[in-house]
Amino acid sequence: MTREAAIAHALAHFDSGAFQRDVARRVAIPTESQNPERAPELRRYLVDEMTPAFEALGFTCRIIEEPRAKGPFLFAERIEDPSLLTVFGYGHGDVIRGLDDGWEPGLSPWTLTERGDRWYGRGVVDNKGQHSANLAAQASVISTRGRLGFNAKWLIEMGEETGSPGLREVCSAHLDLFRSDVLIGSDGPRPDRNRPTIYLGTRGGASMDVFIDAREGGHHSGNWGGLLSSPAIQLAHALASITSPRGQILIPEWLPTGGLPDPVRRALSGLELDMGEDSPAIDPGWGEPGLSGPEKVFGWSSFEILAMESGNPRGPVNAVPPRAWARCQLRYVVGIEMADIIPALRRHLDRAGFPFVQVEPAREEVFPATRLDPDSPWVGWALDSMRRSTGKEPALLPNLGGSLPNDAFSEILALPTLWVPHSFNGCSQHAPNEHWTAELAREALVVMTGLYWDVPESGIARRR
């Protein structure tokens, strides 16, 4: 049997509606990891849904518990021959909150609904549809070839949307069990929905609370205004000192030393951003001057104020508020020292005259920045495979603009990491009306079936 036959098998699986039914069944399990009441659903997804799917393909499965995690982990492996290459797969079955009331009439986060070319449902792209596509592609290779031609290991976690607590501990505790030659996973969007894409790592993400606690209780703004310091005004000035009025970061420790690396600039040359037909227009003058849009997202750091509060926004009263607070976030690239992010902000605020502004980490888990060397033989192999499968020129991203727990694989397991996203920027993945397109879902099966078929022919030596 041939590569073309394997891809034809995958397309027949899609065209029959079987793949959509698999995704629909998984979307119907409300695996909200941010909702403690959904904890039983996290386990049900692994035990009742994914374990049978893996076992049907000859995998052996086990549930791994970790006290720090929001839910269990599923490890599945299919060992055909210890001398063969081993591919490690990853997915997360948890989703963010459904936000049920915000969906368009006739749509529900827990019912896969097809409207035109779109499939609506919570998790349809983040991440249930994406790891379903990869597993279906492996099934097509097995059905066509009679075997994968390599060993396969998978880890499905249920806490990615809460920062992947426990994932690093699980990887550290199971180094031998998880030993592999490469990670091939799928999450996140393509920058251009029409171009198959590989990204080699992720920007890091660090969230922090920046706040002022000036005094106990509010005081009448008529009697005390002009006499008491205003935490809101002070915090606004402090936050404004972090960037220019156009969003250029002014803390040197948060930026790549020496500017944009030449390999990153070359990889991003000519890349166009497709943010989706329902997305806002890009503000070309925002952010770091002199960089293209792709360079700002994939090669540079960005700072955001995610939320701010002082007083009572829903019911303002005539009082000087005692407190002002902001949740901030830095997305950063390889080369920024993760442990120095908050200390650098502290030093900056002190220099700027704001020693009274307090800074605290907003969450325990921080995603480090990671990036595989673009010259890795796995990169050229994957790009060639995708060209062959689709007839399109794939995009190569040094890293995703968002954050993933890629460091668990690239640093702890020491794996080369290839991420092949099957989504697009306008998919509403963390909002109501999350959706995939049938066109992208179908092409995902083509791309992944070709990649898995080509693994035995890669000529890349096993790691020792």
Regions found by a protein language model. Name each.
Residues 125, 216, 330-338, 367:
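A generic structural motif
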Residues 198-213, 418-423:
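Flexible glycine/proline-rich, aromatic-decorated loop/lid segments
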Residues 119, 123-201, 460-463:
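Acidic/histidine-rich catalytic neighborhood of metal-dependent amide-processing enzymes
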Residues 93-95, 118, 155-164, 186-190, ...:
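Acidic, glycine-rich active-site loops and adjacent beta-strand->loop/helix elements
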Residues 225-246:
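A short core secondary-structure module
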